[in-house]
Amino acid sequence: MRRRMEINHHRTYRGKAAVFLLVTAALLAGCANERTEDELSYRKIGIESMQSGDYEGALAAFDGALACCTGKITDLEIDICYYKAAAQYAAQDTEGALETYNAMIDYDGKNANAYYLRGCLKLGTGDTDGAKQDFADAVKYNHSDYELYINIYKNLAAYDLAEDGTAYLNDAFSIKGNDAESLAY
């Protein structure tokens, strides 16, 4: 009889533990959903602030969105970082934008777009060697993006470095071809 009571007690305990775990999981999922909604709301406010020229407000909103992130970094946080860097640049905080791109590259060392955008900023600050290295890394991690090669060439040419950009232009032609139809992208 005593053994039967112990078994029933264990069943009851396991049942309560299972219910507790399910309720906890549901609450945490609800919190995660709420955080994601808050993050999206802040992101939207940031984008709207950028569109109206309120870059400081945009930065505050993007920082608020990123503060909602706890745990795993997702594509949403990466997207918010791109917006944050754009707002920093628009607010003439090139150093802040560079730091944001540095953080993105530290997180994902193969983020070709972050390398490209950081290279563009470095080019604008006069760090041509740093820009060239970032452009090389961008194509290293996204070697089949025709438009990336063309954009690198255009950026280099805009800073009187067309000669350095010629290799990128030639690589673009090897990706897409150099007949008239291919060039009409």
Please provide the spans of the model-predicted regions.
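Canonical positions in the second alpha-helix
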Residues: 65, 103-104, 137-138, 171-172
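Helix-start (N-cap) detector for alpha-helical repeat units in TPR-like alpha-solenoids
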Residues: 39, 73-74, 78-79, 112-113, ...
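Canonical tetratricopeptide repeat
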Residues: 76-79, 83, 117, 151, ...
